[in-house]
Amino acid sequence: MIEDFSEHHVGEANTLQHHGYPRKLGNSVLTLPLRQGAKGHPQHWSPYTDNGGTIAAIAGSNYVVLGADTRLNGDFCIHTRSDTSKLFKLTDRIFLASSGMQADRLQLQQMLKYRIQWYQYNNGGKVPSTKAIAKLTSTMLYQRRFFPYYTFNMIVGIDEKGAGVCYSYDPVGSTEPFRYGTCGSASSFVEPLLDCLLTRQHMVTQAPADLTMEEALGMLKNAFTGAAERDIFTGDTVCFHIITADGVGTEMFELRKD
């Protein structure tokens, strides 16, 4: 019986080996093929993400009204409804306004802050002009042109003559001063409205004269209200900064929450 049992299992082992299985399994290692992506759907990774939000500004003869919503998005989620990091105070009369990726936005803000502090340290506490800070921002963005900050920026403030000025940038630092500007997820809704109300370059009727501070603030409130109705990445609250030669005033304006 023992001989029959041994012969039976030896024959079975030979049969398994014949079909490609190893004779000994004690030291064998089980390996699985790597999982492949579905055909036609290659896997991509991006270092950037857009956290949404909209900024807009109108410059007048002696003021600038600057606004940004407080919604911080990620994909189709709302991370917070009280994000005020889109507006960053550089000096008493100059602000950096940014939308886009929050991490890059915060990095750019800190780098500009350190460069301005370094300038003041080397110049006896002298505050750089709005034009100088605008040029510095352009240079810093251009230095990162091969791996740019994923931010959409404006420098706004009061110039040496006491007039409001707004500098708008592309991702690699090209800029020029404008009377008004807007960036962010709802800029395609806000900018045509400001074009229509402020310059009327595409209309026969003459453009209005310089707005008062109250008129500019009301115009931006209407623009953000309309943007929140059309853009899901803009909403909750708008933080307005009214910048003059005497200082900065702040006003909060409620938008829809959904």
From Swiss-Prot:
Record's PANTHER family? METALLOPROTEASE TLDD (PTHR32194), PROTEASOME SUBUNIT BETA TYPE-1 (PTHR32194:SF2)
Locations listed in the record? Cytoplasm; Nucleus
Q: What is the phylogenetic placement of the source species in the record? A: Eukaryota, Discoba, Euglenozoa, Kinetoplastea, Metakinetoplastina
User: One cellular component GO annotation, for this chain's record?
Assistant: nucleus
Please give the Gene3D superfamilies that the UniProt record associates with this protein.
Glutamine Phosphoribosylpyrophosphate, subunit 1, domain 1
Role according to the record? Non-catalytic component of the proteasome, a multicatalytic proteinase complex which is characterized by its ability to cleave peptides with Arg, Phe, Tyr, Leu, and Glu adjacent to the leaving group at neutral or slightly basic pH. The proteasome has an ATP-dependent proteolytic activity.
Disulfide bond annotation, renumbered to this chain: none
Which UniProt keywords are present, listed alphabetically? Answer: Cytoplasm, Nucleus, Proteasome
The identity of this protein, by name, is Proteasome subunit beta type-1
This protein's major location comes to cytoplasm
Entry keyword Magnesium: no
